[in-house]
């Protein structure tokens, strides 16, 4: 995470750009591979990360411009999670690191949004890309999946902010470029006739020194092909 002042400044600029209404930020949830607790590697929504910085599942947030409120909605970890993860900071402590002082249980976001809807307050949201997001919009706001109308001002506000990079963002981009170069060099050193593509992918993952957010982009999705330079 960056400093809390960075996230506070980003949110303040967005509020100034949009001007009024309520901004809804849908965080991502865990996604099970073959049962609920055996999950794929988690990736937080990029917009949620940009404005709130918290890379944890099961969170959503609102910026209520009209009432000058910034709230993160989420639940504390249960003992089942703590067994696997060890002692963790509370959600309130995590949120304070992003400059958010108000945290509420996740179930309360539905009531908050419905109250705003009944008052005629504009509710801005971004395009959905997961079924879970569509289900939440239907549950909270009665928006039928496929009938979403994302807020154009919200989209433009986010895009215009993210187009311009701060020095600390550029530093992180440069680190990512170094990792990418290391992965390419590792692949070049590893590949040879008779090796499986999965071995090349494994070398890239280990050689990058960081856990990848996305799979290695090699020619075949399954990585089960043999390298044979005699074939075209």
In which residue ranges do the predicted regions lie?
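Residue-level signal for secondary-structure boundary elements
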Residues: 121, 146-148, 185, 192, ...
């Amino acid at each position: 995470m960056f400093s809390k002042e960075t996230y506070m400044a980003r949110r303040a600029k967005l509020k100034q750009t949009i001007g009024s209404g309520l901004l809804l930020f849908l965080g991502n949830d865990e996604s099970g591979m073959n049962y609920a607790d055996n999950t794929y590697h988690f990736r937080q929504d990029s917009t949620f990360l940009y404005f709130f910085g918290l890379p944890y599942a099961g969170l959503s947030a609102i910026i209520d411009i009209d009432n000058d409120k910034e709230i993160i909605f989420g639940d504390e970890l249960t003992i089942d999670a703590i067994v696997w993860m060890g002692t963790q900071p509370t959600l309130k402590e995590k949120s304070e690191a992003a400059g958010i002082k108000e945290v509420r249980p996740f179930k309360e976001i539905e009531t908050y949004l419905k109250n705003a809807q009944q008052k005629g307050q504009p509710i801005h949201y971004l395009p959905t890309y997961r079924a879970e997001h569509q289900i939440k919009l239907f549950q909270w706001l009665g928006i039928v999946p496929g009938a979403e109308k994302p807020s154009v001002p919200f989209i433009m506000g986010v895009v215009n902010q993210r187009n311009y990079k701060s020095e600390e963002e550029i530093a992180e981009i440069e680190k990512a470029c170094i990792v990418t170069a290391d992965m390419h060099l590792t692949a070049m050193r590893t590949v040879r006739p008779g090796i499986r593509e999965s071995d090349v992918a494994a070398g890239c993952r280990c050689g990058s020194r960081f856990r990848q957010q996305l799979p290695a982009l090699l020619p075949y999705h399954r990585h089960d092909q043999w390298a044979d330079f005699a074939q075209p």
